[in-house]
Each structure stands twice: as structure tokens, then as C-alpha cells.
Curated annotation (Swiss-Prot):
Protein known as: Sirohydrochlorin cobaltochelatase
Gene that this sequence comes from: cbiK
Disulfide bonds: none
Additional remark text: In the absence of Co(2+), can act as a precorrin-2 ferrochelatase since, in conjunction with a uroporphyrinogen III methyltransferase such as CobA from P.denitrificans, it can complement an E.coli cysG deletion strain. However, this complementation is easily inhibited in the presence of low concentrations of exogenous cobalt, a result that can be explained on the basis of a higher specificity for cobalt over ferrous ions.
EC number: 4.99.1.3
Function: Cobalt chelatase responsible for the insertion of cobalt during anaerobic cobalamin biosynthesis. Can catalyze the insertion of Co(2+) into either sirohydrochlorin or precorrin-2. It is not clear which is the natural substrate in Salmonella.
Entries under NCBIfam families matching the protein: SiroCoChCbiK (NF047852)
Subunit structure: Homotrimer.
Length: 264
């Protein structure tokens, strides 16, 4: 039976960032199941259109990729999401998998990065590996994307766990709670004298470059600076962290093992 591995991410239009993060994840996932042929899909229609119009590069949606795999005779397909939370983008994959499940003998789906309590614990350990050495009055602030979906609560949960465990970092979100102003007020009250800004995103794309690290007056860097807390931005996506890539590999194999147990 022909076997495939389909790695699905939101996507990025930055080629170097894609190589450092998405390709790095794909490489580790593919190495963990060498009997499968590797394929890629993006969930962002906007990024797919931009790559097609700007670069002439065609990337499939998950639905298109699965339809092509079925047409090519793949009957055992393992999908791994590279999303951070179980939000709208991941639910899009779930719906498309359910729709096309009858076309395959076996179709598995590995969950996003933050899907269980243990994932939060492991993520904090993984983040520690990429954090710079800090003075006593410094902290790292991680920028999450945020969401209108109820899964936005994952960012507040991670932030709460960090605070409760005296982990030297906080988490905010660009498009939902916790807003950066809340973090600025809280850190100022704590007497924090400097922060390091890092993306809590698979890739360091538009949000990290413009909303986090730019000299624009509304960027997180400038807002911390204006509040008297010097901010140093770091432009590296989570996909560059080997420990985080290992979490995605573990999720892939959890889904595959569960499918074996259910079939037994």
C-alpha cells in the first residue's frame, strides 16, 4: 500500500523563513517515517495566492492535496498539523479530513503543538532552550498570533502557567487576549527593566517582523520602549527549535499508534 506524509501549516511567503522553519519540520517528520512520501499543504488562502501571483509557486490546500493523493493511489496518509493551537485553521483541516476519509484505507491526523496539559509543560521546557541568558530583572515576552476562535484561551493558559511556575517569560497575542498593554503594565509593576521579544509562532513572518520588531510606533518593541522597558527583538520561528520539532514528531506518531490500536 502506498503511504504518504502530508505536513500542513498556515504557510509563509518568506522563502528563507520557510526553509528555516517549515522545511526543517518537514525534514524531521519525514525522517521519522521513511516509508512515507512527503507532501506539503498550506491552510492560508492569502499566502497560497501570494506565492502563485508573485513567484509562480503552487501550494495545495489540505483538500486539494488529499484529492491528489487519492488520485495517485495513496491509501495510507498520515497528516501532521504544524499549527500552534486548535483554532480555526486546524478545524479547517479536520473538516476536510472528515470529508475525504472514505477515499482512504487509513487517514490519520496529528494534533497541533498545544493540545494537552503535557504539551504546555514540554513547550515551556523547549522554549527555555532558545531563550537568551537573562538578568534578574529581565524577562522574555512571547508574541502569539491570537484568534477569534475560543482556542485563544491557550495563550492565556500558557501565560498563567509561566507566572505560576515563576518561569521568566510572559505570553501575549497580537489579535486577542492577553494584549500587550496588559503585559506592559504587569511587567512594569514587577520592576522588570528589560525584555526580549520572541515569536510564539511557527515562522517569524509578517507579525514578527512588523508587529513585534519594527520601528513602527505601534510595534511591541516601540511600546515597551515607550513604557521605559527596553525591548530586544529576536526573529526566529518555533520551527527553528529542535525540541519543538520533536513535539510535532511525537504528535504524528501518537496519531499513527492510536490508529493501529483502534484497528487491532
Amino acid at each position: 500500500m502506498k503511504k504518504a506524509l502530508l505536513v500542513v501549516s498556515f504557510g509563509t511567503s518568506y522563502h528563507d523563513t520557510c526553509e528555516k522553519n517549515i522545511v526543517a519540520c518537514e525534514r524531521d517528520l519525514a525522517a521519522s517515517c521513511p516509508d512515507r512520501d512527503l507532501f506539503r499543504a498550506f491552510t492560508s488562502g492569502m499566502i497560497i495566492r501570494k506565492l502563485r501571483q508573485r513567484d509562480g509557486i503552487d501550494i495545495d490546500t489540505p483538500l486539494q492535496a488529499l484529492q491528489k493523493l487519492a488520485a495517485q493511489g495513496y491509501q495510507d496518509v498520515a497528516i501532521q498539523s504544524l499549527h500552534i493551537i486548535n483554532g480555526d485553521e486546524y478545524e479547517k483541516i479536520v473538516r476536510e479530513v472528515q470529508l475525504l476519509r472514505p477515499l482512504f484505507t487509513r487517514l490519520t491526523l496529528g494534533v497541533p503543538l498545544l493540545s494537552s496539559h503535557n504539551d504546555y509543560v514540554q513547550l515551556m521546557q523547549a522554549l527555555r532552550q532558545q531563550m537568551p541568558s537573562l538578568r534578574q530583572t529581565e524577562k522574555v515576552v512571547f508574541m502569539g498570533h491570537g484568534a477569534s476562535h475560543h482556542a485563544f484561551a491557550a495563550y492565556a493558559c500558557l501565560d498563567h502557567m509561566m507566572t505560576a511556575q515563576r518561569f521568566p517569560a510572559r505570553v501575549g497575542a497580537v489579535e486577542s487576549y492577553p494584549e500587550v498593554d496588559i503585559l506592559i503594565d504587569s511587567l512594569r509593576d514587577e520592576g522588570v527593566t528589560g525584555v526580549h521579544l520572541m515569536p510564539l509562532m511557527l515562522v517569524a513572518g509578517d507579525h514578527a517582523i512588523n508587529d513585534m520588531a519594527s520601528d513602527d510606533g505601534d510595534s511591541w518593541k516601540m511600546r515597551f520602549n515607550a513604557a521605559g522597558i527596553p525591548a530586544t527583538p529576536w526573529l526566529s520561528g518555533l520551527g527553528e527549535n529542535p525540541a519543538i520539532r520533536a513535539m510535532f514528531v511525537a504528535h504524528l506518531h501518537q496519531a499513527l499508534n492510536m490508529a493501529v490500536e483502534e484497528a487491532a
